[in-house]
Amino acid sequence: MRTSLIAAGALLALAINVAGARAATPEETSLRDELRRLAERLERVEKRNAALEAQLKTYADRPARSQGEIEARIKALESYNKRLEDALADEGISEREPELASRLKAVEYNTLDIKKQATVIDSIEGFAAGASFTSVGQRATSVDTNGTTLNYRADITVTTPTVKTGDIESKLFGHFRVGQGRGISQNLTSFAGPNVSSFQLGTAIPAENSALLLAQAYYRADIPLPFGGFKPQSREKLTINFGKMDPFAFFDQNAAANDETRQFLASPFVHNALLDNPLAANVGADGFGFSPGVRVAYRNERTKSEPWGLSFAMFGAGRGANFSEGFRSPFWIGQAETTQRFGGLTGNYRAFLWRNGQAPTFLRDPANLDEALLRPHRGGGLNFDQRFGDYITYFGRLGWASGEGLPFDRALALGAEIGGSYWSRGGDALGIAFGANRSSEAFRNTSAQVVDAAGTPVFGFAARGSERVAEVYYRFRVHQNFEISPDFQLIREAAGNPAARPVKVIGIRLQLNQ
């Protein structure tokens, strides 16, 4: 190519010289100028070609010169990979290993930590826990000894996750309780206990000490009916509980008068007075209100807004209530309940029958006059709570019993809980209740003759008529987890004593829950 460019340039110069030997015409002059420009462009192209050839030679020689550098880089990369593999094979982290290995190990450890945390979360998922603290201070008039008392009680509950076995759902429930203070009942002879929230572990434990009690621990299984049917369409259920339980958690419930930590404090307005009272509680539980047993319940929700149910249970009584002996002469109870609506307002109605083969009495055991004589008792009760208006719930309890040594054999309680929305305090409530407990004929005839081992009269009066009880409380909600409740009670003719002065009990309750 370079030779052809030189020949073209020579011919161009020759043509220019020939044209210059004679006088040039204008066309020849223009042609000569054009040829000159072409010659200059050819010269520049030649120089550019020479430069490109030089660069091409340089690039052609470069791989041969850098081959050694590439081999060195490959060896360095192989060495780095070997160090990285060795570092990853060791679980430890060293400052001498490649940074990439350290970072990979750090990511791996963080991932393992996250997995461990997820495992812990999975292991506790489904657990439910609750805690509450209740403290009550009361002052009573017309009592012979100290009329001012203070007590506290703390409750912790835990429910395990639901375990499904086919269509059957089961879980465990645990309840721990601790407290101090026995309340005014220890200084007052009455069919009604002014403070159901009082609790202290054992009479032998000094009052300055406190101990934790496993109050409840039981198993629950819910079985949809019919057994083996299609669960999503089931409207019937069978529930089985067994273990250590509070019988009142399953029987004699009431929406307006059931919780001594938030509602009424006096025992006739918390439970049926014949089953729970300071003198001779027929419920058959231990000294703290709990006993081992088994319960079977049937619930029918074919009419969703008005379900009904039947339940039956057997609990330990006497020494069997505290596991000192087996289920000899236990406490039996059966209950029928239904939910009804009147004018769109919900009401719950219950009827129950019970029998205690070894219930405590007001009589003394001839073998030990300091101990109560145990005798079979039987009875029944009615219970209702009915909404009235938007924020009022009425309640009522009626009880009757028969058997030897009953201090009273009839019990009646009526009252209402009024929601604070009527005075723009939706979280508050006002409770009002009245009750009467009729002394039994046996108690009226023999109460004055009952003495203890030292010959001291246990009651010291001849009973007659009925004990009458009234209570008013106001529950003031400070915030969602804290409530303060001033409380007033009036007891007339306590334990049927016609000579007893009216007992006025003023108190205040603090309630914390979580």
List PLM regions with ranges:
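N-terminal periplasmic/intermembrane-space "pro-region" immediately following the signal or transit peptide
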Residues: G20-G147, P161-I168, P232-Q233
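Residue-level signature of outer-membrane beta-barrel architecture
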Residues: D122, T160-K164, A221-I223, K244, ...
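Outer-membrane beta-barrel pore domains and translocons
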Residues: T134-Q138, R177-G179, G243-P247, R299, ...
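Membrane-embedded beta-strands of outer-membrane beta-barrel proteins
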Residues: I156, A217, V294-V296, G334-A336, ...
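Repeated loop/turn-to-beta-strand initiation elements of outer-membrane beta-barrel proteins
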Residues: K164-L172, P226-F227, T303-L310, F342-Y349, ...
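Surface-exposed coil loops of outer-membrane beta-barrel proteins
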Residues: N187-Y218, P226-F331, Q335, Q449-F459
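Outer membrane beta-barrel transmembrane domains
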Residues: E337, R350-L374, R378-D385, F395-R397, ...
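Outer-membrane beta-barrel "beta-signal"
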Residues: P502-Q514
